Protein backbone atom coordinates (compact mmCIF):
# COMPACT_ATOMS: atom_id res chain seq x y z
CA UNK A 1 0.00 0.00 0.00
CA UNK A 2 1.31 3.40 -0.89
CA UNK A 3 1.15 6.34 1.52
CA UNK A 4 2.23 4.86 4.84
CA UNK A 5 3.93 8.10 5.87
CA UNK A 6 1.53 8.44 8.79
CA UNK A 7 3.50 5.79 10.66
CA UNK A 8 6.77 7.70 10.61
CA UNK A 9 6.19 8.88 14.19
CA UNK A 10 6.16 5.31 15.51
CA UNK A 11 9.09 3.85 17.43
CA UNK A 12 11.69 2.46 14.99
CA UNK A 13 11.15 -1.19 15.99
CA UNK A 14 7.45 -0.86 15.17
CA UNK A 15 7.80 1.08 11.89
CA UNK A 16 9.19 -1.86 9.94
CA UNK A 17 6.59 -4.27 11.33
CA UNK A 18 3.73 -1.91 10.46
CA UNK A 19 5.17 -1.26 7.02
CA UNK A 20 5.39 -5.00 6.29
CA UNK A 21 1.84 -5.54 7.55
CA UNK A 22 0.45 -2.80 5.31
CA UNK A 23 2.40 -4.00 2.30
CA UNK A 24 1.36 -7.61 2.86
CA UNK A 25 -1.53 -8.12 5.32
CA UNK A 26 -0.85 -11.82 5.98
CA UNK A 27 -1.51 -13.89 9.11
CA UNK A 28 2.23 -13.97 9.83
CA UNK A 29 2.68 -10.21 9.46
CA UNK A 30 -0.39 -9.51 11.61
CA UNK A 31 0.94 -11.89 14.28
CA UNK A 32 4.32 -10.12 14.21
CA UNK A 33 2.56 -6.77 14.47
CA UNK A 34 0.66 -7.90 17.59
CA UNK A 35 3.77 -9.43 19.16
CA UNK A 36 5.73 -6.21 18.59
CA UNK A 37 3.16 -3.87 20.10
CA UNK A 38 4.26 -1.09 22.42
CA UNK A 39 0.77 0.30 23.04
CA UNK A 40 -1.64 2.65 21.32
CA UNK A 41 -0.18 5.47 19.27
CA UNK A 42 -1.77 8.36 17.40
CA UNK A 43 -2.07 6.17 14.32
CA UNK A 44 -2.88 2.81 15.98
CA UNK A 45 -6.00 2.09 18.04
CA UNK A 46 -7.21 -1.15 19.61
CA UNK A 47 -10.84 -2.12 20.18
CA UNK A 48 -11.95 -5.16 22.10
CA UNK A 49 -14.89 -5.57 19.71
CA UNK A 50 -16.61 -3.74 16.89
CA UNK A 51 -18.17 -0.50 18.08
CA UNK A 52 -21.48 0.99 17.01
CA UNK A 53 -21.38 2.72 13.61
CA UNK A 54 -21.66 6.32 14.87
CA UNK A 55 -18.73 5.80 17.27
CA UNK A 56 -16.76 4.06 14.53
CA UNK A 57 -17.34 7.02 12.21
CA UNK A 58 -16.02 9.44 14.86
CA UNK A 59 -12.88 7.29 15.26
CA UNK A 60 -12.42 7.07 11.50
CA UNK A 61 -12.79 10.83 11.06
CA UNK A 62 -10.31 11.57 13.85
CA UNK A 63 -7.77 9.16 12.36
CA UNK A 64 -8.31 10.43 8.80
CA UNK A 65 -7.85 14.03 9.96
CA UNK A 66 -4.62 13.04 11.73
CA UNK A 67 -3.01 11.53 8.65
CA UNK A 68 -4.43 8.00 8.62
CA UNK A 69 -3.93 4.93 10.77
CA UNK A 70 -5.15 1.54 11.89
CA UNK A 71 -7.94 0.26 14.14
CA UNK A 72 -7.56 -3.33 15.34
CA UNK A 73 -10.74 -5.13 16.43
CA UNK A 74 -10.37 -8.03 18.85
CA UNK A 75 -7.46 -6.69 20.91
CA UNK A 76 -7.73 -4.67 24.09
CA UNK A 77 -4.98 -2.63 25.68
CA UNK A 78 -5.29 -2.97 29.45
CA UNK A 79 -4.56 -0.24 32.00
CA UNK A 80 -1.18 -1.82 32.78
CA UNK A 81 -0.31 -1.48 29.04
CA UNK A 82 -0.45 -5.25 28.46
CA UNK A 83 -2.81 -6.67 25.85
CA UNK A 84 -5.77 -9.03 25.81
CA UNK A 85 -6.03 -10.97 22.53
CA UNK A 86 -9.52 -12.44 22.94
CA UNK A 87 -10.55 -11.72 19.36
CA UNK A 88 -14.01 -10.95 18.04
CA UNK A 89 -16.88 -13.44 17.97
CA UNK A 90 -17.48 -13.22 14.24
CA UNK A 91 -15.88 -11.58 11.25
CA UNK A 92 -18.10 -8.65 10.27
CA UNK A 93 -18.96 -8.59 6.57
CA UNK A 94 -17.26 -5.71 4.75
CA UNK A 95 -20.50 -4.86 2.93
CA UNK A 96 -22.25 -4.45 6.30
CA UNK A 97 -19.48 -2.17 7.57
CA UNK A 98 -19.70 -0.06 4.42
CA UNK A 99 -23.49 0.08 4.58
CA UNK A 100 -23.45 1.08 8.28
CA UNK A 101 -21.13 4.04 7.76
CA UNK A 102 -21.77 5.20 4.18
CA UNK A 103 -24.24 7.93 5.15
CA UNK A 104 -21.75 9.47 7.59
CA UNK A 105 -18.47 9.64 5.67
CA UNK A 106 -17.35 11.16 2.41
CA UNK A 107 -16.47 8.82 -0.43
CA UNK A 108 -13.08 10.57 -0.35
CA UNK A 109 -12.28 8.91 3.00
CA UNK A 110 -10.57 5.71 1.90
CA UNK A 111 -10.30 2.64 4.11
CA UNK A 112 -9.82 -1.11 3.85
CA UNK A 113 -10.79 -3.91 6.22
CA UNK A 114 -8.70 -7.07 6.55
CA UNK A 115 -9.69 -10.34 8.24
CA UNK A 116 -7.35 -12.53 10.28
CA UNK A 117 -8.55 -15.94 11.48
CA UNK A 118 -6.14 -18.12 13.47
CA UNK A 119 -7.15 -21.76 13.67
CA UNK A 120 -3.65 -22.39 14.97
CA UNK A 121 -0.66 -20.18 15.57
CA UNK A 122 2.82 -20.46 17.00
CA UNK A 123 1.81 -17.42 19.06
CA UNK A 124 -0.51 -19.26 21.45
CA UNK A 125 -2.51 -16.18 22.47
CA UNK A 126 -3.96 -15.94 18.94
CA UNK A 127 -5.08 -19.56 18.56
CA UNK A 128 -8.76 -20.02 17.68
CA UNK A 129 -9.35 -16.26 17.53
CA UNK A 130 -10.57 -13.86 14.85
CA UNK A 131 -9.48 -10.26 14.31
CA UNK A 132 -10.19 -7.49 11.87
CA UNK A 133 -8.04 -4.53 10.96
CA UNK A 134 -9.34 -1.31 9.46
CA UNK A 135 -6.74 0.79 7.68
CA UNK A 136 -7.78 4.42 7.21
CA UNK A 137 -5.67 5.91 4.46
CA UNK A 138 -3.90 9.24 4.51
CA UNK A 139 -5.78 11.55 2.12
CA UNK A 140 -4.39 15.03 2.91
CA UNK A 141 -6.00 16.56 -0.16
CA UNK A 142 -9.46 16.12 1.38
CA UNK A 143 -8.78 17.14 5.01
CA UNK A 144 -10.71 18.10 7.04
CA UNK A 145 -13.10 15.17 6.93
CA UNK A 146 -16.40 15.86 8.65
CA UNK A 147 -19.44 13.75 9.37
CA UNK A 148 -21.98 14.09 6.59
CA UNK A 149 -24.78 13.45 9.06
CA UNK A 150 -25.25 14.15 12.77
CA UNK A 151 -24.14 11.13 14.77
Regions found by a protein language model. Name each.
Residues 1-151:
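Conserved N-terminal catalytic/coupling substructures associated with nucleotide/phosphate chemistry
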Amino acid sequence: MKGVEYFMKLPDQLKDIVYRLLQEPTLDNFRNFLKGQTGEHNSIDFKEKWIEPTKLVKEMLAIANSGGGIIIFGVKEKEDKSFSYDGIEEIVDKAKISNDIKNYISTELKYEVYDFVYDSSEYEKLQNHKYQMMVIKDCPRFIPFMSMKES
